[in-house]
Amino acid sequence: MNYDLLDTLFQAYFDVRKGKRNTVNQLRYELNMEHELLELYDDIVSRRYNPSRSICFLLTELEIKREIFGANFRDRIVHRLIHDQIAPLFERTFIADSYSCRKGMGTLYAIRRLDHHIRSCSRNYSRPCWVLKLDVQGYFFSIDRKILYAMLRSYLERHWTAYCAAQPAGRYMLDSELLFYLLERVIFHDATQNCIVRGSRKVWADFPPSKSLFHAAPDCGLPIGNLTSQLFSNIYMDRFDQWM
């Protein structure tokens, strides 16, 4: 048994548990925590891991409705494991003005950066400058999963030494074969298959297909709601960010 990997899974569990102590799925998982984590460990090392059913619902509290897929608690642990393994490397490559779901780079930080750039470009408001505002329609649902996986695998293979160096001191590193296996299982999992859809028909009636994973092209789209989806989307967009 690889006790370092098992310990890393336990740590991922404790990280996922933060802020979810009172949820039904977390409480159910915690009742059999040791057994559940050992079973997850066995599934991972024996290459039998498959993501479970997600719960799909519409987030209606915001001005714009969002389709959210809530992963099974077990799968959230795997998402955390993957995220913590690769995020330190890719965070170093992102441009300074990429703000989506990045620690310490929230809305206030973005506003301050925008103010800095406007003042710099306009020479402290003494000459005109322009701001380009655009949006990639249905971005999450247009991400090609085959391209995403190829990008991740190619970059990690070419920068494996940097990947190892980027890890915080004391953190266990997955070997490349296991990391690529987990990336493949998560990226190519179709969250729409056998998912549990919640919400009345009235709530869903006027939801635009362009904003739904159910209407994405084959092998395209990432579920909004997964921790890994946020990181993957930043990695996928990074080439465009660098070009801009």
PLM feature segments, named:
Residues 1-38:
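Non-catalytic, polymerase-adjacent accessory regions of viral genome-replication enzymes
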Residues 4-10, 51-58:
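Short beta-edge/loop segments at beta->alpha junctions of small alpha/beta modules
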Residues 7-10, 34, 38, 71, ...:
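Non-catalytic, well-ordered alpha-helical scaffold segments
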Residues 43, 80, 84-93, 117-121, ...:
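Mid-sequence acidic-hydrophobic segments that form the walls
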